[in-house]
Amino acid sequence: MAKVVSRIVKLQIESGSAKPSPPVGPAIGQAGIPIMAFCKAFNAATEGMEKGIPIPTTVTCYKDKSFTFTMSQPPVSFFLKKEVGIKSGSKLPGKESCGSITRENIRKIAQLKMQDMGAIDIEGAMRMVEGSACSMGISVVD
């Protein structure tokens, strides 16, 4: 017999640092699954990754108090900030630039994110990444 899904929780957790404190604890606890069991499983799954990378995670909670989770690639904004070397995007995107990125770097990010994006080809994924860069105030150079 298939397990009955009780809730699906979407979180963005930094790799290797899932703790029972907010925001992870309350979101997982309300779903009725053991918080420490999830934290240990998530930290074990992200053990080989660099610390502090934001990981979009979807936790599927079942009626019998068990759970499964899937992790995606970090957001495009994380990759853009890492490539440009900035802490945050521009406060006035379109008016002031906070850095620049090359098309080769955009292609590299698009290839990493291709599986999570709804793009059909690499050019479409590159346009999505360029749009994210533009909305963050990062200029794209050739």
Curated annotation (Swiss-Prot):
GO terms for molecular function: large ribosomal subunit rRNA binding; structural constituent of ribosome. Pfam families: Ribosomal_L11, Ribosomal_L11_N. PROSITE patterns: RIBOSOMAL_L11 (PS00359). Keywords: Methylation, Ribonucleoprotein, Ribosomal protein, RNA-binding, rRNA-binding. Disulfide bonds: none annotated. Forms part of the ribosomal stalk which helps the ribosome interact with GTP-bound translation factors. It comes from the Bacteria. One or more lysine residues are methylated. This is Large ribosomal subunit protein uL11. One of its GO terms (biological process) is translation. Part of the ribosomal stalk of the 50S ribosomal subunit. Interacts with L10 and the large rRNA to form the base of the stalk. L10 forms an elongated spine to which L12 dimers bind in a sequential fashion forming a multimeric L10(L12)X complex. One of its GO terms (cellular component) is cytosolic large ribosomal subunit.
